[in-house]
UniProtKB/Swiss-Prot annotation:
Biological source species: Bos taurus
Protein encoded by which gene: RSU1
Keyword Lipid biosynthesis in record: no
Name this polypeptide is given: Ras suppressor protein 1
Keyword Nucleotide-binding: no
Physiological role: Potentially plays a role in the Ras signal transduction pathway. Capable of suppressing v-Ras transformation in vitro.
Name of a matching Pfam family: LRR_4
Protein backbone atom coordinates (compact mmCIF):
# COMPACT_ATOMS: atom_id res chain seq x y z
CA UNK A 1 0.00 0.00 0.00
CA UNK A 2 1.35 3.43 -0.86
CA UNK A 3 2.24 5.85 1.92
CA UNK A 4 -0.22 8.60 2.78
CA UNK A 5 0.64 12.14 1.72
CA UNK A 6 0.86 13.11 5.39
CA UNK A 7 3.42 10.35 5.96
CA UNK A 8 5.45 11.50 2.94
CA UNK A 9 5.59 15.04 4.35
CA UNK A 10 6.53 13.82 7.85
CA UNK A 11 9.25 11.50 6.54
CA UNK A 12 10.74 14.20 4.38
CA UNK A 13 10.89 16.55 7.37
CA UNK A 14 12.22 14.01 9.89
CA UNK A 15 14.82 12.43 7.61
CA UNK A 16 15.60 15.68 5.80
CA UNK A 17 14.86 13.95 2.48
CA UNK A 18 15.46 16.31 -0.45
CA UNK A 19 13.07 14.61 -2.90
CA UNK A 20 9.30 14.28 -2.53
CA UNK A 21 7.30 12.26 -5.07
CA UNK A 22 3.52 12.70 -4.96
CA UNK A 23 2.76 11.65 -8.51
CA UNK A 24 -0.53 9.96 -9.43
CA UNK A 25 -2.33 10.57 -6.12
CA UNK A 26 -5.53 12.23 -7.37
CA UNK A 27 -4.47 15.55 -5.78
CA UNK A 28 -6.66 18.47 -6.84
CA UNK A 29 -5.31 21.17 -4.48
CA UNK A 30 -1.76 21.52 -3.15
CA UNK A 31 -3.13 23.37 -0.09
CA UNK A 32 -4.81 20.11 0.97
CA UNK A 33 -1.39 18.54 1.56
CA UNK A 34 -0.77 19.42 5.21
CA UNK A 35 2.72 20.71 5.89
CA UNK A 36 3.88 20.61 2.26
CA UNK A 37 4.88 24.27 2.21
CA UNK A 38 6.93 23.92 5.40
CA UNK A 39 9.39 21.62 3.60
CA UNK A 40 11.69 24.48 2.67
CA UNK A 41 14.66 22.08 2.50
CA UNK A 42 13.40 20.01 -0.44
CA UNK A 43 15.13 20.28 -3.81
CA UNK A 44 12.76 18.11 -5.86
CA UNK A 45 8.96 17.98 -5.90
CA UNK A 46 7.07 15.70 -8.28
CA UNK A 47 3.31 16.23 -8.64
CA UNK A 48 2.84 14.75 -12.10
CA UNK A 49 -0.34 12.86 -13.10
CA UNK A 50 -2.65 14.59 -10.63
CA UNK A 51 -5.73 16.84 -10.96
CA UNK A 52 -4.29 20.23 -10.06
CA UNK A 53 -5.94 23.26 -11.71
CA UNK A 54 -3.85 25.97 -10.02
CA UNK A 55 -0.56 26.38 -8.18
CA UNK A 56 -0.82 28.41 -4.95
CA UNK A 57 1.46 31.41 -4.28
CA UNK A 58 2.87 29.42 -1.33
CA UNK A 59 5.09 27.61 -3.86
CA UNK A 60 7.58 30.41 -3.12
CA UNK A 61 8.11 28.92 0.38
CA UNK A 62 9.92 25.96 -1.22
CA UNK A 63 12.89 28.18 -1.91
CA UNK A 64 15.45 25.40 -2.40
CA UNK A 65 13.57 23.65 -5.22
CA UNK A 66 15.75 22.70 -8.18
CA UNK A 67 13.27 20.35 -9.88
CA UNK A 68 9.51 20.95 -10.04
CA UNK A 69 7.36 18.55 -12.04
CA UNK A 70 3.68 19.27 -12.78
CA UNK A 71 3.45 17.10 -15.92
CA UNK A 72 -0.09 15.96 -16.81
CA UNK A 73 -2.38 18.01 -14.61
CA UNK A 74 -5.11 20.53 -15.53
CA UNK A 75 -3.26 23.70 -14.50
CA UNK A 76 -4.75 26.81 -16.10
CA UNK A 77 -2.62 29.47 -14.44
CA UNK A 78 0.55 29.95 -12.44
CA UNK A 79 1.20 32.46 -9.65
CA UNK A 80 3.72 35.25 -10.23
CA UNK A 81 5.49 33.92 -7.11
CA UNK A 82 6.82 30.95 -9.09
CA UNK A 83 9.54 33.22 -10.45
CA UNK A 84 10.96 33.70 -6.95
CA UNK A 85 12.34 30.14 -7.01
CA UNK A 86 15.93 31.27 -7.43
CA UNK A 87 17.44 27.77 -7.53
CA UNK A 88 14.95 26.16 -9.93
CA UNK A 89 16.76 24.39 -12.78
CA UNK A 90 14.11 22.08 -14.21
CA UNK A 91 10.43 22.99 -14.58
CA UNK A 92 8.02 20.57 -16.24
CA UNK A 93 4.56 21.98 -17.06
CA UNK A 94 3.86 19.67 -20.00
CA UNK A 95 0.29 18.39 -20.59
CA UNK A 96 -1.61 21.14 -18.81
CA UNK A 97 -4.08 23.88 -19.83
CA UNK A 98 -1.94 27.00 -19.69
CA UNK A 99 -2.84 29.76 -22.12
CA UNK A 100 -0.65 32.38 -20.49
CA UNK A 101 2.46 32.62 -18.31
CA UNK A 102 2.64 35.00 -15.34
CA UNK A 103 4.28 38.41 -15.41
CA UNK A 104 7.92 38.18 -14.41
CA UNK A 105 8.21 34.51 -15.40
CA UNK A 106 11.53 35.27 -17.12
CA UNK A 107 13.28 36.09 -13.85
CA UNK A 108 14.12 32.49 -12.92
CA UNK A 109 17.91 32.91 -12.81
CA UNK A 110 18.97 29.24 -12.80
CA UNK A 111 16.40 27.63 -15.12
CA UNK A 112 17.99 25.19 -17.59
CA UNK A 113 15.11 22.99 -18.76
CA UNK A 114 11.58 24.31 -19.37
CA UNK A 115 8.92 21.93 -20.68
CA UNK A 116 5.67 23.59 -21.83
CA UNK A 117 4.66 20.83 -24.26
CA UNK A 118 0.95 20.29 -24.90
CA UNK A 119 -0.61 23.46 -23.52
CA UNK A 120 -2.64 26.25 -25.17
CA UNK A 121 0.17 28.79 -25.49
CA UNK A 122 0.98 31.16 -28.36
CA UNK A 123 3.29 34.11 -29.00
CA UNK A 124 0.95 36.40 -27.01
CA UNK A 125 1.09 34.14 -23.94
CA UNK A 126 4.70 34.95 -23.14
CA UNK A 127 5.46 37.75 -20.66
CA UNK A 128 7.79 40.54 -21.79
CA UNK A 129 10.77 39.15 -19.91
CA UNK A 130 10.38 35.52 -21.04
CA UNK A 131 13.53 35.68 -23.15
CA UNK A 132 15.57 36.80 -20.12
CA UNK A 133 15.77 33.07 -19.33
CA UNK A 134 19.29 33.08 -20.78
CA UNK A 135 20.40 30.04 -18.75
CA UNK A 136 17.98 27.77 -20.68
CA UNK A 137 19.56 24.75 -22.36
CA UNK A 138 16.31 23.04 -23.40
CA UNK A 139 12.98 24.65 -24.32
CA UNK A 140 10.04 22.43 -25.24
CA UNK A 141 7.10 24.29 -26.83
CA UNK A 142 5.65 21.45 -28.94
CA UNK A 143 1.88 20.96 -29.26
CA UNK A 144 0.90 24.57 -28.64
CA UNK A 145 -0.56 27.30 -30.87
CA UNK A 146 2.43 29.42 -31.90
CA UNK A 147 2.11 31.02 -35.35
CA UNK A 148 5.20 33.15 -34.83
CA UNK A 149 8.37 32.49 -32.86
CA UNK A 150 9.40 35.87 -31.38
CA UNK A 151 12.75 37.21 -32.69
CA UNK A 152 13.96 37.44 -29.08
CA UNK A 153 14.51 33.65 -29.26
CA UNK A 154 18.00 34.70 -30.40
CA UNK A 155 18.77 35.82 -26.83
CA UNK A 156 18.66 32.23 -25.55
CA UNK A 157 22.20 31.58 -26.74
CA UNK A 158 22.78 28.56 -24.45
CA UNK A 159 19.91 26.58 -26.00
CA UNK A 160 20.91 23.10 -27.10
CA UNK A 161 17.39 21.73 -27.63
CA UNK A 162 14.46 23.65 -29.12
CA UNK A 163 11.26 21.74 -29.79
CA UNK A 164 8.48 23.48 -31.74
CA UNK A 165 6.77 20.42 -33.20
CA UNK A 166 3.03 20.55 -33.95
CA UNK A 167 2.33 24.25 -33.63
CA UNK A 168 0.93 26.61 -36.29
CA UNK A 169 4.25 28.26 -37.19
CA UNK A 170 4.15 30.08 -40.52
CA UNK A 171 7.76 31.30 -40.36
CA UNK A 172 10.93 31.17 -38.31
CA UNK A 173 12.79 34.39 -37.39
CA UNK A 174 16.29 34.98 -38.75
CA UNK A 175 17.47 35.23 -35.12
CA UNK A 176 17.25 31.45 -34.87
CA UNK A 177 20.63 31.54 -36.60
CA UNK A 178 22.13 33.02 -33.39
CA UNK A 179 21.52 29.80 -31.43
CA UNK A 180 24.95 28.42 -32.28
CA UNK A 181 24.95 25.81 -29.49
CA UNK A 182 21.77 24.17 -30.81
CA UNK A 183 22.06 20.40 -31.20
CA UNK A 184 18.37 19.55 -31.67
CA UNK A 185 15.70 21.45 -33.57
CA UNK A 186 12.21 19.99 -33.95
CA UNK A 187 9.91 21.94 -36.30
CA UNK A 188 7.82 19.13 -37.80
CA UNK A 189 4.05 19.48 -38.17
CA UNK A 190 3.81 23.24 -38.70
CA UNK A 191 2.79 25.51 -41.61
CA UNK A 192 6.34 26.37 -42.71
CA UNK A 193 7.04 26.88 -46.40
CA UNK A 194 10.57 28.36 -46.26
CA UNK A 195 13.55 28.48 -43.90
CA UNK A 196 15.51 31.65 -43.06
CA UNK A 197 18.98 31.53 -44.69
CA UNK A 198 20.42 32.32 -41.23
CA UNK A 199 19.48 28.80 -40.15
CA UNK A 200 22.48 27.84 -42.27
CA UNK A 201 24.72 29.32 -39.53
CA UNK A 202 23.87 26.30 -37.39
CA UNK A 203 25.46 22.88 -37.50
CA UNK A 204 22.52 20.50 -37.39
CA UNK A 205 23.70 17.89 -39.89
CA UNK A 206 26.27 15.96 -37.82
CA UNK A 207 25.69 12.48 -36.43
CA UNK A 208 25.01 13.81 -32.94
CA UNK A 209 22.63 16.55 -34.12
CA UNK A 210 18.90 16.20 -34.72
CA UNK A 211 16.88 18.25 -37.22
CA UNK A 212 13.28 17.14 -37.73
CA UNK A 213 11.13 19.05 -40.20
CA UNK A 214 8.64 16.68 -41.85
CA UNK A 215 4.94 17.47 -42.32
CA UNK A 216 5.41 21.06 -43.43
CA UNK A 217 4.15 22.48 -46.77
CA UNK A 218 7.66 23.35 -48.05
CA UNK A 219 8.11 25.25 -51.31
CA UNK A 220 9.23 22.89 -54.07
CA UNK A 221 13.00 23.69 -54.05
CA UNK A 222 13.23 22.98 -50.31
CA UNK A 223 11.02 19.89 -50.55
CA UNK A 224 13.34 18.60 -53.30
CA UNK A 225 16.39 19.07 -51.06
CA UNK A 226 14.68 17.24 -48.19
CA UNK A 227 14.27 14.28 -50.55
CA UNK A 228 18.07 14.21 -50.86
CA UNK A 229 18.74 14.63 -47.13
CA UNK A 230 19.18 17.21 -44.37
CA UNK A 231 22.77 18.09 -45.34
CA UNK A 232 21.49 19.04 -48.81
CA UNK A 233 18.86 21.32 -47.26
CA UNK A 234 21.52 23.16 -45.26
CA UNK A 235 23.84 23.42 -48.24
CA UNK A 236 20.97 24.85 -50.29
CA UNK A 237 19.81 27.48 -47.76
CA UNK A 238 23.42 28.70 -47.47
CA UNK A 239 23.58 29.33 -51.23
CA UNK A 240 23.34 32.79 -52.82
CA UNK A 241 20.59 31.45 -55.09
CA UNK A 242 18.44 30.57 -52.10
CA UNK A 243 19.10 33.88 -50.33
CA UNK A 244 17.87 35.69 -53.43
CA UNK A 245 14.77 33.47 -53.78
CA UNK A 246 14.02 33.77 -50.06
CA UNK A 247 14.22 37.57 -50.26
CA UNK A 248 11.78 37.63 -53.17
CA UNK A 249 9.46 35.17 -51.45
CA UNK A 250 9.31 37.33 -48.29
CA UNK A 251 8.74 40.51 -50.32
CA UNK A 252 5.82 38.88 -52.11
CA UNK A 253 4.27 38.26 -48.66
CA UNK A 254 2.37 35.12 -49.74
CA UNK A 255 -0.75 33.92 -47.97
CA UNK A 256 0.26 31.39 -45.27
CA UNK A 257 -1.02 27.82 -45.64
CA UNK A 258 -4.32 27.11 -43.92
CA UNK A 259 -4.46 25.85 -40.35
CA UNK A 260 -4.71 22.16 -39.67
CA UNK A 261 -8.05 21.53 -37.96
CA UNK A 262 -6.89 18.36 -36.22
CA UNK A 263 -5.60 20.49 -33.36
CA UNK A 264 -9.09 21.17 -32.03
CA UNK A 265 -9.11 17.53 -30.91
CA UNK A 266 -6.42 18.25 -28.32
CA UNK A 267 -7.41 17.13 -24.82
CA UNK A 268 -6.37 20.50 -23.41
CA UNK A 269 -9.05 22.14 -25.59
CA UNK A 270 -11.87 20.12 -24.05
CA UNK A 271 -13.90 21.49 -21.13
CA UNK A 272 -12.82 19.91 -17.85
CA UNK A 273 -16.20 18.31 -17.18
CA UNK A 274 -16.06 16.46 -20.48
CA UNK A 275 -12.57 15.22 -19.75
CA UNK A 276 -13.40 13.84 -16.33
CA UNK A 277 -16.45 11.85 -17.32
Amino acid sequence: MSKSLKKLVEESREKNQPEVDMSDRGISNMLDINGLFTLSHITQLVLSHNKLTTVPPNIAELKNLEVLNFFNNQIEELPTQISSLQKLKHLNLGMNRLNTLPRGFGSLPALEVLDLTYNNLNENSLPGNFFYLTTLRALYLSDNDFEILPPDIGKLTKLQILSLRDNDLISLPKEIGELTQLKELHIQGNRLTVLPPELGNLDLTGQKQIFKAENNPWVTPIADQFQLGVSHVFEYIRSETYKYLYGRHMQANPEPPKKNNDKSKKISRKPLAAKNK
